[in-house]
Amino acid sequence: MTDLRQLQYFIACVETGSFSEAARILYTTQSSVSKAMKAMEESMGLLLFERMPKGIVPTAQGRKVYRYTCRILKEVEALNHISASGETKWLRVSTNPSSWFATQFVSFYNQNYEKNYHCQVYTSGVRTVMERVRDYKDDVGFIYLMEHREQGLQYELGKNHMEFVPLHQVDAMLYLGEQHPDYGDSREVPSLSSLRFIQNYQDEFLNDDTWEGEDGSLLSEQMDVSVVTNSDYIMQAMLQNTDLGNISPDGLSHSDKFINHDTMQLENQEQSVQFICIFRNDQKMERLPKKFLTFIKNYVME
C-alpha cells in the first residue's frame, strides 16, 4: 500500500527528473528514493517512470498519478492546519508577472487582515500557471491571452477539467524607458526599428506574432530585444533607468499611481489581449478564491 512518504518522494522525483536530485532535496539517499519508487510502482501495478541514461521521465500513467498526488498532498496540508480554533483558510493564486496585480494582492490582504487568511502567490508564464491550477497547486490562475489563441486555450483547459472567465480586454502598448529622448513626448510613436527592447518570456498563448509595425511588417521581425526576463521587478527597474522600450498588454498602466510609465498605443492592432482567470470545473470553487476573484474583477472593471 502506498504511504505518504512515498507520495512525497514521488512528487520530488517528478519535479526534479532525477532520483539523486530528489534525494538531495529530501535529505536522504538515492538508494532510499529509488527503492521507495520501485515499491510504489509494484504496489500500484504501474510503471511510473522511464529510466533514462541521464535521469527519469514520468510515463503517461506517472503524469496522471502526479496530478492526483498533488491534490492528495494539498488536502493533507489542509488537515495539518486545522486547529482547535478552527480551519485555517488558504488562498492559492498563480499569475503572470504583474506589478499592478501585486499591488492589488497587497490591498486585498490588508483589507482582510483581521480574518487571518493564509496565502500562497506564484508568478510564472501562462503554461506554468495552467499546470499549477490543473495539478491542484493553486485555486485560481490569472493570465493574459492573445485573442486568436483562445480556441487553443479552451482545448487545453477542457481536456484537463478547467475553464476560464474573461475579466478585461486590453490593447498592446509601447512603454518607453525614462532615459529615452522621446520619453514624455507622446504625440507620436517613435520608429520601432530605432528602439531596443526588454520583453517578457513568451509562450504559445501570449506572443507578438500578429502585432504589426508602422510599415505593416511583423513586430517580431523589427524588434531588437536586448533583455528578456520573467521578472516584473527587472522590467520596472529597466524601464525606470534605461532607454529600452517594452511592448506588452496594457497592464502596467494599472500601476501608474505608483510608477509613471510613458505609454503609447500601437497602431495596426487587430488582435486584442484578454486578461482572464482560469480554474478547475470538476469541483466547486471555495469561498475565499471566489472572493479574491470578485475583488480583482471589480478592480479591472473600474
Label each PLM-derived region with a short phrase.
Residues 262-302:
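A late-sequence structural motif
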Residues 156-201:
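Flexible hinge/capping segments at coil-to-helix
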Residues 43-44, 65-87:
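Alpha-helical linker/hinge and terminal dimerization helices associated
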Residues 1-30, 36, 65:
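N-terminal short secondary-structure element
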Residues 134-137, 204-263:
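Hydrophobic hinge/microswitch elements
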Residues 88-153:
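Central regulatory/effector-binding core of bacterial HTH transcription factors
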Residues 102-105, 182-219, 286:
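Secondary-structure junction motif
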Residues 41-58:
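A short LG(V/I)-centered, amphipathic sequence patch enriched
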